[in-house]
């Protein structure tokens, strides 16, 4: 499918494809699909996305753990690297940031094994989600 390419205003190296059509999931019906596959899985695109995302958190928000959902582990690893960079006034400078992925139980609920619970319990957690569904009524 051919889509329209949209570039980020914050980082012109970041781009996504938007495809018009009818896309149905178990929970929603959408008129457009935003393809962020390249952003999640390509080295250079994931790095650029992480640099851009890190700008929002580097100087204001402490992050102990990044929880990666929807296949966003590559992006999460780059994000942790950029958040922990040793820069002036960075909140997470030289910090060891955990990057984890939960499991799912048979009902589709998130499950953190015993060895991961200390990384999320009473911690500053950043959820990295690559699935968004916008619902509204007119």
Locations of the language-model features?
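PRPP-associated nucleotide enzymes
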Residues: 1-138
């Amino acid at each position: 499918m051919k889509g329209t390419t949209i570039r980020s205003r914050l980082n012109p190296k970041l781009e996504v494809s938007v495809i018009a059509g009818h896309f149905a999931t178990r929970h929603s019906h959408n008129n457009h699909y935003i393809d962020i596959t390249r952003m999640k899985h390509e080295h250079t695109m994931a790095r650029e996305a992480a640099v851009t995302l890190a700008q929002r958190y580097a100087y204001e928000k402490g992050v102990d753990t990044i929880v990666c959902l929807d296949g966003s582990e590559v992006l999460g690893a780059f994000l942790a690297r950029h958040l922990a960079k040793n820069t002036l006034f960075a909140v997470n400078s030289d910090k060891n940031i955990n990057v984890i992925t939960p499991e799912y139980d048979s009902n589709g609920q998130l499950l953190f094994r015993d060895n991961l619970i200390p990384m999320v319990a009473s911690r500053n957690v950043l959820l990295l989600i690559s699935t968004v569904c916008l619902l509204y009524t007119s």
